[in-house]
Amino acid sequence: LFIDLKHSTNLRTTAKELDVPERRFVRFLIERRFVYRTASGNVLPYANVKNAGLFCVKDYYNHGHIGSYTLVTPQGKLYFAQLREMILLVS
């Protein structure tokens, strides 16, 4: 596994770093209540103690559109790397 511990990365890049399928990774995060999917389809972390330091949310404004996206912090990447085998078991 190659995990960049200097930068926070989006869910897709984090899944690639962990060598797990992106959809399976997101499904794991949703099932384990680390994140939830908004009505608009965004994936955002729950604000709870379990998630402290694992994620950060960035807001953006682009051509009149305002939105948010979730990044996994280096601490979060290490945490999910330890759960990699469990993530791979998600159907």
Protein language model regions, located:
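Positively charged, aromatic-accented nucleic-acid-binding surfaces
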Residues: 2, 6-12, 16-91
